[in-house]
Design a protein with these regions (language model features):
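Conserved helix-loop functional segments at active or binding sites
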Residues: 27-31, 54, 74-77, 106, ...
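Short glycine-rich loop/turn motifs
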Residues: 19, 30, 44, 62-67
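C-terminal reverse transcriptase regions that engage the nucleic-acid substrate
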Residues: 1-33, 169, 178-179
Length: 197
């Protein structure tokens, strides 16, 4: 994402970053995604969602990361800046969860169109317990009343049994790599998680 920001006015620093990315691609050509119906989740769609709270120091916006898995490997993923300034980590994660739900709905519809209908709720894995609780609550509380109503469709999908939001430890959060820069050791571990290895 850092490299993408410099595309409008690329300079020498952007070229150095680009060369580093190209060297990374050359050195990792042997790494890939493997799909298998014998995977842990079989042919169940699952999603991992994460957010960094106010990661953009210039604007205060958070970054959303979502990874969708099917047959043991990622089939869709995204990393994007949120369009609202979240005043808490719970809000940032909940906004990210809203984006994940939209992706899940789209992919469930796609699977239905090819006769792979998802009967059970799609598991969405989130590493913020407050956001998990918020998604399952039916009341708007004083702590959450400021959150824009457009994000509360998450609760509706949970109530209908379309999605089931579950807590996952941060160390096992596959979407973490999509929200922030990580150190070398954590990056290598998260890369394997993201690929479903």
């Amino acid at each position: 994402m850092v490299l993408a920001k410099s595309m409008s006015k690329p300079g020498p620093r952007a070229m150095i970053k680009l060369k580093r990315v190209l060297r990374y691609f050359e050195g990792t050509m042997h790494i890939g995604i493997t799909y298998s119906e014998d995977s842990e989740d079989g042919e169940m769609l699952t999603a991992y969602v994460d957010s960094d709270h106010a990661g953009d120091l210039d604007t205060g916006y958070s970054t959303t990361g979502v990874a969708l898995y099917f047959a043991g490997g990622p089939v869709d993923w995204m990393s994007t800046k949120q369009t609202v300034v979240a005043i808490s980590t719970v809000e940032a994660e909940y906004v990210a969860m809203s984006k994940a739900c939209l992706m899940v709905i789209h992919f469930r519809n796609l699977l239905t169109s090819i006769n792979q209908q998802q009967v059970q709720a799609t598991n969405i894995f989130e590493d913020n317990q407050g956001a998990v609780s918020l998604s399952k609550g039916s009341k708007i509380t004083p702590r959450t009343k400021h959150i824009d109503i457009k994000f509360h469709h998450v609760r509706s999908l949970v109530a209908k049994g379309v999605v089931d939001v579950k807590y996952v430890e941060t160390d096992l959060q596959r979407a973490d790599i999509l929200t922030k820069s990580l150190g070398a050791v954590k990056f290598l571990k998260n890369r394997l998680l993201l690929l479903g290895v």
